[in-house]
């Protein structure tokens, strides 16, 4: 779930009712893609959403904005991620940084993947494809490292073609 879908009180309540039905155990995956866009969010909605998820997906620009919102302006990006991981009891925090790679933080461990070099046609859909590939791999029982690599490769492919939802070649759907 994300913040954009929570602009309306009706959809926000629906999302929260759905989240209420999810068992809170080690096997559940509750992914919050923060999506801080324009003025479509507020601190209360963001904080409550982070309390409801166990996987947070955020990009580097959103991390700066969130850090400012929570009073973490003068803290380096990795420390912000560790603080968020602990404060919100997350099992995973995914930080995407565009051409500067991406990080997956878990309690006690961080993974880094460089961004593949591609000719960028369109970045719309890059974050969503990253999240979808990552979660799809986890649901298939793949390791965090394998999920991270698949997410990076899928997102890079999406950036190399026009449109947010290209047909993925079979190598990305394994």
Predicted regions and their residues:
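Conserved beta-alpha-beta core of the PfkB/ribokinase-like small-molecule kinase fold
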Residues: 2-79, 101
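Conserved phosphate-binding/catalytic region of the ribokinase-like
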Residues: 20-21, 70, 74-174
């Amino acid at each position: 779930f994300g913040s954009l879908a929570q602009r309306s009180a009706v959809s926000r309540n629906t999302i929260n009712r759905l989240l209420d039905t999810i068992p809170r155990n080690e096997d559940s995956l509750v992914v919050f893609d923060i999506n801080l866009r324009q003025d479509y969010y507020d601190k209360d909605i963001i904080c409550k959403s982070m309390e409801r998820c166990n996987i947070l997906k955020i990009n580097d620009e959103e991390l700066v904005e969130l850090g400012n919102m929570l009073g973490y302006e003068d803290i380096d990006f990795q420390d912000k991620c560790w603080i968020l991981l602990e404060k919100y009891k997350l099992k995973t925090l995914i930080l995407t940084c565009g051409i500067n790679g991406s990080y997956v933080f878990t309690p006690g461990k961080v993974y880094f993947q460089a961004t593949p070099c591609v000719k960028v046609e369109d970045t719309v859909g890059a974050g969503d494809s990253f999240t979808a590939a990552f979660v799809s791999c986890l649901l298939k029982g793949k390791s965090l490292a394998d999920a991270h690599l698949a997410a990076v490769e899928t997102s890079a492919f999406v950036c190399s073609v026009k449109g947010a939802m290209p047909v993925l070649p079979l190598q990305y759907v394994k």
